[in-house]
UniProtKB/Swiss-Prot annotation:
Organism listed in the record: Deinococcus deserti (strain DSM 17065 / CIP 109153 / LMG 22923 / VCD115)
Name of the protein in its database record: Sec-independent protein translocase protein TatA
Residues forming coiled coils: none
UniProt entry tagged with the keyword Nucleotidyltransferase: no
Compartments (UniProt record): Cell membrane
Lineage, uppermost ranks: Bacteria, Thermotogati, Deinococcota, Deinococci, Deinococcales
Pfam families xrefs: TatA_B_E (PF02416)
Function: Part of the twin-arginine translocation (Tat) system that transports large folded proteins containing a characteristic twin-arginine motif in their signal peptide across membranes. TatA could form the protein-conducting channel of the Tat system.
Entry membrane topology: Single-pass membrane protein
Record region (Disordered): 36-82
Protein family (similarity comment): Belongs to the TatA/E family.
Ranges of Basic and acidic residues composition bias in the record: 36-47
One of the protein's GO biological processes: protein transport by the Tat complex
GO molecular function: protein transmembrane transporter activity
Keywords linked to the UniProt accession: Cell membrane, Membrane, Protein transport, Translocation, Transmembrane, Transmembrane helix, Transport
Length: 82
């Protein structure tokens, strides 16, 4: 499919050297190596278990403060009219 010959590979290396500069190439390679190493480690290590979702009744939140809004009336029972 993508058969790169020696000329294409040399051309790619020259373009990369022009873009990043000769001084940055070792740092670029080191960073890529670390990234690949971390990726491989993550692939081999099992992921930690996910926390269980519990059924917590949802509360209404005040749109301004974000604080839970009480569903109970704030008027004392003696002041209520029936």
């Amino acid at each position: 499919m993508l058969g790169f010959g020696p000329f294409e590979l040399i051309l790619i290396v020259v373009i990369i050297a022009l873009l990043f500069g000769a001084r940055k190439l070792p740092e670029l390679g080191k960073g890529m190596g670390r990234g690949i190493k971390e990726f491989k480690q993550e692939m081999h290590e099992p992921s930690p278990p996910r926390p269980q979702v519990t059924d917590i009744p949802s509360q209404r939140l005040d749109p301004v403060t974000g604080a839970p809004v009480s569903t109970e009336s704030t008027v004392p029972a003696s002041d209520r009219r029936s």
